[in-house]
């Protein structure tokens, strides 16, 4: 009798474990295919590194801290994922505190297409494109001052240039990026104007 009860509990235990595993698998699968950014993260951007053939800097910010913030990346078509931790620091912008995260990917293969995503708070974000330089000729987008009244002109200029030059490897923004560097709304307008660009190719800002 005791043996039967033991076997029954064993079967029930295995059943529960299998159900939990299946549930976790569904969650991970849903996260893997998400088309949304990591909750709380905004203004994801690539920054030029010392050597763009083998390294890249990824930055983003959030209004609240993100636990265990990191960047996962992989070569396109390869399921092997690497991870690098992100350093978070408090940054005060126009009297408002926010969290600024920085992750540096190194020892990347040259001349390849990769993709990266943000992780944190037990969640993952969507994949973003990233390509490393091959050391040869390249195309870059070079913009003058982007400061303006409402940044609609800057948005039109940047987006049209990116569409006409999809092969561009990075972009340079010379001079004054915003009219008032102490006005956080202007920085948000500057970043919003670069949606779909700055997360895909790195920026080389010149203040």
For every predicted segment, state its role.
Residues 1-6:
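Positively charged n-region of N-terminal signal peptides that target proteins for export
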Residues 7, 58, 125, 152, ...:
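Short, low-complexity intrinsically disordered segments
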Residues 9, 13, 20-142, 163-164:
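Acidic, histidine-bearing metal-coordination/catalytic regions of metal-dependent phosphoesterases
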Residues 135-207:
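Active-site neighborhood of divalent metal-dependent phosphoester/pyrophosphate hydrolases
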């Amino acid at each position: 009798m005791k043996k039967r009860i033991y076997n029954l509990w064993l079967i029930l235990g295995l059943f529960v474990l299998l159900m939990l595993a299946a549930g976790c698998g569904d969650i991970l699968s849903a996260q893997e295919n998400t088309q949304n950014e990591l909750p709380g993260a905004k203004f994801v951007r690539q920054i030029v590194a010392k050597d763009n053939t083998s390294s890249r800097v990824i930055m983003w910010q959030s209004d609240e801290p993100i636990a265990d913030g990191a960047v996962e990346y992989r070569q396109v078509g390869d399921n092997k994922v690497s991870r690098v931790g992100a350093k978070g620091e408090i940054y005060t912008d126009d009297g408002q505190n926010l969290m600024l995260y920085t992750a540096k990917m190194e020892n990347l293969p040259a001349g390849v297409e990769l993709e990266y995503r943000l992780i944190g708070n037990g969640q993952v974000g969507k994949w973003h494109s990233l390509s490393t330089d091959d050391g040869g000729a390249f195309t870059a987008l070079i913009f003058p001052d982007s400061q303006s009244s409402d940044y609609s002109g800057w948005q039109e200029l940047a987006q049209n240039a990116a569409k006409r030059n999809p092969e561009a490897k990075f972009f340079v923004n010379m001079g004054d990026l915003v009219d008032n560097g102490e006005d956080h709304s202007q920085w948000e307008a500057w970043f919003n104007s670069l949606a779909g660009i700055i997360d895909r190719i790195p920026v080389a800002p010149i203040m």
